[in-house]
């Protein structure tokens, strides 16, 4: 008889346990629009700043883990003594981890810190890229971007990104090492999509 009572108790409690298993937070989807400034180095060792912007779509799906896709465009009018400019568009995607915390006080704000590693392609144009045959005005190369940032939410659907910093590695042909390491800084607005 005790066995029957035990089975009946398990059957009675089973729906509550199953209901608890089904309740989970829906994925968070963010769209960030940022101004970006990129510090790069030309072949002769001279440095330059490129300015532009980016649009980034990210989703957090499980305990801070998620993914991001970033499309950025930057332009420098003069990267070398000869006056050659550079326009670069990068399209990268990859994993992201986000840690969030609610700040207590008069104004309750949610702060989120994120770190990411994104890979993709960089398209350089309006410049000079050496090649075995002749110089070209554009090139498509591998791009690796890693870094992170801070988001400060003011409401459920709106946040600001006071700082984002990324290291960007590209492999444009330059007649020397064919490797460029740049730092990209950004700040802007984040829209949290329902």
Give the label of every model feature segment.
Residues 56-132, 141-144, 161, 183-192:
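Gram-negative (and chloroplast) outer-membrane scaffold detector with strong preference
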Residues 155-194:
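Predominantly the C-terminal beta-signal and adjacent terminal strand-loop region
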Residues 37, 90-92, 167:
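Detector for outer-membrane/organellar transmembrane beta-barrel domains
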Residues 139-141, 153-155:
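C-terminal transmembrane beta-barrel domains of outer membrane proteins
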Residues 1-25, 194:
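Cleavable N-terminal export/targeting peptides
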Residues 19-61, 67, 117-119, 184-194:
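Short glycine/proline- and aromatic-enriched beta-strand/turn motifs that initiate or cap beta-hairpins
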Residues 40-43, 78-84, 130-136, 171-177:
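Extracellular loop and loop/strand-boundary signature of outer-membrane beta-barrel proteins
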Residues 30, 66, 112-114, 149, ...:
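Membrane-spanning beta-strand positions in outer-membrane beta-barrel proteins
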């Amino acid at each position: 008889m005790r066995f029957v009572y035990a089975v009946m108790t398990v059957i009675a409690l089973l729906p509550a346990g199953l209901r608890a298993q089904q309740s989970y937070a829906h994925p968070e989807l963010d769209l960030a629009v940022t101004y970006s400034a990129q510090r790069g180095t030309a072949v002769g060792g001279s440095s330059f700043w490129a300015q532009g912007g980016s649009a980034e779509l990210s989703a957090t799906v499980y305990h801070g883990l998620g993914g991001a896709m970033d499309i950025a465009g930057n332009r420098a009018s003069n990267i070398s003594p000869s006056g050659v400019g550079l326009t670069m568009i990068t399209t990268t995607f990859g994993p992201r981890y986000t840690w969030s915390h609610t700040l207590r006080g008069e104004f309750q704000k949610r702060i989120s810190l994120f770190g990411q590693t994104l890979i993709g392609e960089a398209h350089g144009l309006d410049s000079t890229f050496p090649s075995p045959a002749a110089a070209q005005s554009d090139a498509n190369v591998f791009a690796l971007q890693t870094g992170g940032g801070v988001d400060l939410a003011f409401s459920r659907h709106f946040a600001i990104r006071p700082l984002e910093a990324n290291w960007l590695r590209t492999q444009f042909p330059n007649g020397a090492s064919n490797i460029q390491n740049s730092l990209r800084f950004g700040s802007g607005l984040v829209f949290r999509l329902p």
